Amino acid sequence: SFTPEEICTLTMEFYRRNYIEGLFLSSGILHSPNETMEQICKALRDLRIIHRFNGYIHCKAIPGADPALIEMAGWYADRMSINLELPTEEGLKRLAPNKTRKTILTPMRQIQNGMAESREYLGMKGGNYGAYHFTQERKQKRLAMRGAKDAFGTHAISRGVTSASGAHTVSRGVKGVPGTNADTGGYKISHSGSGDSVITGTDLMRQGKASSGLQLWNSCDTKRGFVPAGQSTQMIIGASGETDYEIMAVSEALYRRFDLKRVFYSAFINVNKDSTLPALDSQPPLRREHRLYQADFLLRYYGFEANELLSPSRPNFNTYLDPKCDWALGHLELFPVEIESADYDTLLRVPGIGVKSARRILAARRSTKLTFQDLKKLGVVLKRAVYFITCSGRMMYPTKLEEDYIVRNLTDPKDRIRFGSDGMSYRQMTLFDDGMFPNGVRQEEKLII
């Protein structure tokens, strides 16, 4: 491993040559958590104070280290993270017996409380909250204006969100969501089908008890806020038999209870072929990892909840369709959506419409009526959206609002979609198509070159 001096030298040499813009600093445990964290803090302090390094620093906190060392690192780093590793306690005991939920969640809670105290002291209104906080805040304001139902009328207000002061307000539990109890209104630990305990709700709060506050305000020779870029965590996917539903429920609880900026997902790869580690029957679950990232964005930016995307009866994502399309196909009664009148949150739930394109639609339709060509220019992915929207009461072309029909078109390997009742269709020509048309191109088929 590198010494603190070597880390400083390498970082500054790369930084001066404009090879890097920041540093990601992590370490395995050497001798003890405290000794390792001391070395990390020394490297961070030397970079900031001695070398005047002003670049971005993401630092890994070592579970089990002294709270004072965790706080010291937070004053010098932009972002900190503590890996949750696995969503179930049993999986953690089996694959990482040297770690416990308490040693992981306690420093996570300490960092959260320190961030809230720093925000309040510095008067940061927006602060370093994650996207999930602002999405839920917007959602609560909208629901308060409209009543108890959401934009689609699918479920009532039932979740607590983080307030501007950093305090949490919790309402009733939601029926069908792991870790909640609709009768008592309290969050509790849930159990997977295999008997594993899933970390959610009150269990997270109980394991991560609040610290007594920041103690090193004037001791670190820095005017930076405490962890100004927020904190994140990571989970390993496919190592302990957890379902996507369990993983997303844990991620949602972490966003809500610990103000995380991001939850990262890493497909399990058995590198050293250790017999104590699970053996993979196939390739690493990279597509599953991709679907989890897509669903994570739906939680943070689009206002979805874990129990909307998955359920105990359908615990895993569709590998052929992205989670948003899969959700829309299960709720065809809510479509098509009229582009000219739909509000922002309704537009966000349409496949093919993202955050930027939804905002552009709202801005553009104030001055003109939108056509499908306009939507394409605004960034809407018509390949997916065309089945779920209308412009001025008309669809782009006559199509069936049927699940099987839409799935066939969305999963066609050649992406052939008919764009008119005259039979005209489009597809991308490849470099190897020269000899594929001995009789020439058919009149009803147009190739895009």
Mark where each language-model region is.
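Residue-level signature of tetratricopeptide-repeat
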Residues: 364-365
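Short amphipathic alpha-helical boundary/capping segments
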Residues: 347-351
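HhH-family (HhH-GPD) DNA N-glycosylase catalytic core used in base-excision repair
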Residues: 151, 155-158, 164, 194, ...
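A structural motif corresponding to the C-terminal lobe/cap of the Radical SAM core domain
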Residues: 93-94, 99, 103-112, 238-323
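C-terminal extensions
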Residues: 316-346, 372-449
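Conserved Radical SAM active-site core
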Residues: 1-233, 237-241, 254, 272, ...
